[in-house]
Amino acid sequence: MNMVFLGPPGAGKGTYAKRLIEMLNIPHISTGDMFREAVASKSELGKKVEEILKRGDLVPDDLTNSIVKDRLSKEDCKNGFILDGFPRTVAQAKALDEIMRSLGKDLDYVIYFEVDEEEVVKRISNRRICSNCGKIYNLITLPPKVDGKCDVCGGTLYQREDDKEEVVRKRYRVYMENTYPVIEYYQKSNKLFTVNGALDVDSVIKEVLNIIRR
């Protein structure tokens, strides 16, 4: 079962993937993890990625595509995978089609977690992180017992720069401009399934399971 998860920042893709991989016994593959693995491997590809990331640049499509193909060809993907963070553009979606063909696989489901801008802003701008142990809180859904202090270690909670409201709104708009065409691309191939990402986690998981068990 080969799946792609799409959705704006704060849609919960990583959370849903972590729950589902335990049920389905397939790996969760994110581009961030793939880049880190490539760098750690010290391969020629990894060295190129490391140089690009150190400069703060985006990894170009040709390199990203090579890393995705390499990861999807590994043994643990033989029964399926959940791909998160790729494709982000129509060009990458077409490249993924080619990658799947070259590996003799099909893409079974593209799940789009639909969340509106205000919900994304509410989720991300209320996120706080412990400066000491890294535990993540949400002032609305998972608040600390003492305002501004970590329940675990007593460390001070802070807000990341890219979690601030104006930045979150920009990230959402960039996502919709760049990635929404990918959603339209998959609609044409009848592989796209939309899930209401504003529901609670258990309800979203149930929706996804209903889709893949039809």
Curated annotation (Swiss-Prot):
Question: Which residues bind ATP per the record?
Answer: G10, A11, G12, K13, G14, T15, R127, I136, Y137, L199
Which biological pathway?
Purine metabolism; AMP biosynthesis via salvage pathway; AMP from ADP: step 1/1
Which GO MF terms does the UniProt record name?
adenylate kinase activity; ATP binding; zinc ion binding
Q: Which GO terms describe its cellular component?
A: cytoplasm
Keyword annotations for this protein, in alphabetical order, are: ATP-binding, Cytoplasm, Kinase, Metal-binding, Nucleotide biosynthesis, Nucleotide-binding, Transferase, Zinc
Region annotated NMP, chain positions: 30-59
Q: What is its EC number?
A: 2.7.4.3
Tell me what reaction this enzyme catalyses. AMP + ATP = 2 ADP
- Which residues are involved in binding Zn(2+)? C130, C133, C150, C153
Superkingdom to which the source organism belongs: Bacteria
Sequence segments annotated as region (LID)? 126-163
The places in or outside the cell where this protein is found are:
Cytoplasm
GO terms (BP aspect): AMP salvage
The record lists AMP as bound by T31, R36, D57, L58, V59, G85, F86, P87, R88, Q92, R160, R171
- What is the annotated role of this protein in its UniProt record? Catalyzes the reversible transfer of the terminal phosphate group between ATP and AMP. Plays an important role in cellular energy homeostasis and in adenine nucleotide metabolism.
Per UniProt, subunit arrangement is: Monomer.
Q: Which family does it belong to?
A: Belongs to the adenylate kinase family.
Comment on protein domains: Consists of three domains, a large central CORE domain and two small peripheral domains, NMPbind and LID, which undergo movements during catalysis. The LID domain closes over the site of phosphoryl transfer upon ATP binding. Assembling and dissambling the active center during each catalytic cycle provides an effective means to prevent ATP hydrolysis. Some bacteria have evolved a zinc-coordinating structure that stabilizes the LID domain.
Kindly give the PANTHER family that the UniProt entry links to this protein.
Answer: NUCLEOTIDE KINASE (PTHR23359)
The molecule here is called Adenylate kinase
| Organism of derivation | Thermosipho africanus (strain TCF52B)
